[in-house]
Design a protein with these regions (language model features):
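Generic detector of well-ordered alpha-helical segments enriched in charged/polar residues
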Residues: 76-80, 163, 172
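Short, flexible helix-coil linker/hinge segments at the edges of structured domains or between repeats
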Residues: 155-171
Length: 185
C-alpha cells in the first residue's frame, strides 16, 4: 500500500451492499437512473471502513467498503496507514469502525438488536458494537404503512412475553410490543 499523495478531500466510490430485503430504486434515481428497480442492493454505503457480513457472500470480502474513487484502495487502509495524521491524536484508535449509508427500503426492515462492543465481541467475535442515528431524507408507504421507526419496548412488555413472541415468530405481536414513531423528512 502506498499512501495517497492527494490532498483532502478523498473522492470515494459509492458501494452498494447486498441485503435480504428489497429496495434501491430511489438510490438509482438519485444517481440519474430513472429506470432503476428495487432489488437486493438497497443500501449505498457512502462512507465505510467496515465490510458487509452476509452469509453466502464470503467471496466479496470488501463488499460495502469505501474505496478511493477509481482504485482498489480502501478508505480503511488509507486511514490505517497514518491514523493519527488523518484523524488527529485524540481520535486515533487501533480499530476504526465507521459506516454512513443511504437506505431505500421497499419493505419493512427486520427487527434488530444492536449489541454494545463487549457483547459484539463475546457473541460475534467482532470489535464493533453498533450505535446508530438516523436522518430521514424521504419516505414512502410500505405495504400500506406510512414511514415509521419501531424503537424500544412498550412500557408493559416483559422479557418472558417478548421471548414467547420471539420463539413463536409472532411478528405482529412483536411490532405491537414496540414503540412506533412516525417519521417525516
Amino acid at each position: 500500500f502506498m499512501k495517497p499523495t492527494t490532498d483532502f478531500p478523498f473522492l470515494l466510490d459509492n458501494p452498494r451492499a447486498w441485503r435480504t430485503y428489497l429496495g434501491g430504486r430511489m438510490l438509482d434515481a438519485l444517481h440519474g437512473d430513472s429506470n432503476g428497480e428495487d432489488g437486493h442492493f438497497p443500501e449505498e454505503w457512502i462512507l465505510s471502513t467496515v465490510a458487509a457480513r452476509n452469509a453466502g457472500r464470503e467471496q466479496f470480502p470488501e463488499e460495502g467498503m469505501s474505496h478511493l474513487r477509481g482504485t482498489d484502495v480502501t478508505l480503511k487502509s488509507v486511514l490505517e496507514s497514518d491514523t493519527e495524521g488523518y484523524l488527529g491524536k485524540g481520535a486515533a484508535q487501533p480499530t476504526l469502525g465507521v459506516l454512513t449509508k443511504l437506505i431505500d427500503s421497499a419493505e419493512r426492515l427486520t427487527l434488530q438488536v444492536h449489541p454494545d462492543k463487549p457483547t459484539a465481541l463475546r457473541l460475534f467475535q467482532s470489535q464493533y458494537g453498533k450505535t446508530e442515528c438516523w436522518h430521514i431524507l424521504s419516505g414512502h408507504p410500505v405495504n400500506g404503512e406510512e414511514p415509521c421507526i419501531y424503537y424500544g419496548f412498550q412500557p408493559d412488555m416483559t422479557r418472558a412475553r417478548w421471548e414467547a413472541l420471539f420463539h413463536a415468530q409472532d411478528i405482529p405481536g412483536m411490532l405491537a410490543g414496540m414503540q412506533k414513531y412516525p417519521v417525516h423528512p
